[in-house]
A protein has these predicted regions:
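Hydrophobic structural segments
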Residues: 1-113
Length: 113
C-alpha cells in the first residue's frame, strides 16, 4: 500500500486532525506501532523488519532522517495513538476489581487549529 494512502487511513481511523508523514518511497508492507513517544525506537522497528513506523511522537530530526534509511514514518499524536487503548485498560481494571470506580478522563485542553 502507498504510504500516503496508509497515513490518510490512520488519520481517519484515529480521528486525528492531521498526521505527519515522512515518506521513504517504499510501499507499506509491515508496520511497527508505538503509542506516545517512539522516536528512540525507530532503529528497533527497522531491525524487526518494519518498513513503516507509526507512533504518537517522533521528533523533527527523526522524521527528516528516516526516509534516507528506507523507512516510512507516521507521527499521529500522543492522544490519538494512546486514546484507543483507554477503554481496554478500564475494562481490565474493572475485571481485576469490579467494585473499584474507574472512569475515563479526556482532556480537551490541547487542540490543533
Amino acid at each position: 500500500m502507498d504510504a500516503e494512502i496508509f497515513a490518510g487511513q490512520v488519520k481517519r481511523l484515529l480521528g486525528a486532525p492531521f498526521v505527519l508523514l515522512a515518506d521513504a518511497g517504499v510501499p507499506v508492507c509491515r508496520v511497527a506501532v508505538m503509542g506516545g513517544e517512539g522516536g528512540d525506537d525507530v532503529e528497533a522497528a527497522k531491525a524487526a523488519g518494519a518498513d513503516t513506523y507509526l507512533s504518537g511522537r517522533l521528533g523533527y530530526h527523526t522524521m527528516t532522517d528516516a526516509p534516507e534509511g528506507g523507512m516510512n514514518l507516521i507521527e499521529a499524536g500522543h492522544f490519538y495513538t494512546e486514546n484507543p487503548v483507554c477503554a481496554t485498560l478500564q475494562r481490565m481494571v474493572k475485571e481485576i476489581a469490579p467494585d473499584l470506580a474507574c472512569d475515563l478522563f479526556f482532556s480537551g485542553n490541547i487542540r490543533a487549529l
